[in-house]
């Protein structure tokens, strides 16, 4: 059998009412936390017990949630009333003009202008702001310089490696040229030797042939011819 339907009505017994309140309060706060995390929602929860005790939860801060709530309510009311909407935007424009004027004045003061009306405390505050700005500028400058140094170091290492590779290639080409020169020299030397041997052989054969072709001399002299 399924569970019976719970009747939603005030619990008369104070003890049971307190136990139920504690359980439901914890469950409600847990659900609010889950909603804020899962849905990236800004959640604000305010609970007052029957005894007047406050329980609350806010995903960011309760003040920011309430301020946002009040601003949204005002905007909704003004959207429903055109005249109120015009006044709302006029107030917004006035606030923005004041903020712009304050920023411009602060900028001029940080540039060293319009300092006559400032008190000692205001000047000290301005000096602190300038020092903070200078520290931020120096930190950013050091960061950029460090990055540039790292980039230059990387480029230097790359160039050094390229020079080493080129030097190895030049040495290898030089060695190959030396080997080719040696091979060509040996080939030429062997060619000259073969030609000299061939010429010597030809000369020897020629001398032998010349010697063989000469007439043989008789052991007896040719008799003189008779006088006619």
Swiss-Prot record:
MADS-box domain ranges (all copies): 3-57
Tissues expressed in: Specifically expressed in root.
Entry keyword annotation includes rRNA processing: no
Xref: PROSITE patterns: K_BOX, MADS_BOX_1, MADS_BOX_2
Main location: nucleus
An example Gene Ontology biological process: positive regulation of transcription by RNA polymerase II
GO molecular function, one term: protein dimerization activity
Classification via Gene3D superfamilies: Transcription factor, MADS-box
InterPro entries, per the entry: MADS-box/MEF2_TF, MEF2-like_N, TF_Kbox, TF_MADSbox, TF_MADSbox_sf
Keyword line: DNA-binding, Nucleus, Transcription, Transcription regulation
One GO cellular component, as annotated: nucleus
Domain K-box: start-end pairs: 86-176
Subcellular location per the Swiss-Prot or TrEMBL entry: Nucleus
Function text: Probable transcription factor.
Subunit structure: Interacts with AGL15, AGL16 and AGL19. Interacts with SIEL.
PANTHER family: SERUM RESPONSE FACTOR HOMOLOG
Protein name: Agamous-like MADS-box protein AGL21
Species in which this protein is naturally found: Arabidopsis thaliana
């Amino acid at each position: 059998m399924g569970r019976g339907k719970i009747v939603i009505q005030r619990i008369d017994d104070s003890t049971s009412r307190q136990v139920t309140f504690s359980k439901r309060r914890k469950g409600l706060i847990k659900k609010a936390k889950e909603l804020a995390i899962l849905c990236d929602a800004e959640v604000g929860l305010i609970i007052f017990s029957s005894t007047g005790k406050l329980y609350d939860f806010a995903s960011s801060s309760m003040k920011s949630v309430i301020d946002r709530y009040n601003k949204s309510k005002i905007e909704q009311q003004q959207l429903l009333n055109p005249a109120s909407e015009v006044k709302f935007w006029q107030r917004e424009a006035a606030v923005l003009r004041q903020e712009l004027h304050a920023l411009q004045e602060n900028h001029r003061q940080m540039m060293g202008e319009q300092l006559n009306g400032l008190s000692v405390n205001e000047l000290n505050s301005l000096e602190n702001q300038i020092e903070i700005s200078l520290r931020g500028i120096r930190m950013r400058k050091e960061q950029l310089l460090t990055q540039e140094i790292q980039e230059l170091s990387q480029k230097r290492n790359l160039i050094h490696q390229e020079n080493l590779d080129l030097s190895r290639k030049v040495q290898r080409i030089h060695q190959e040229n030396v080997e080719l020169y040696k091979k060509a020299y040996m080939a030429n030397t062997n060619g000259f030797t073969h030609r000299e041997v061939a010429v010597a052989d030809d000369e020897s054969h020629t001398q032998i042939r010349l010697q063989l072709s000469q007439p043989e001399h008789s052991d007896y002299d040719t008799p003189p011819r008779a006088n006619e």
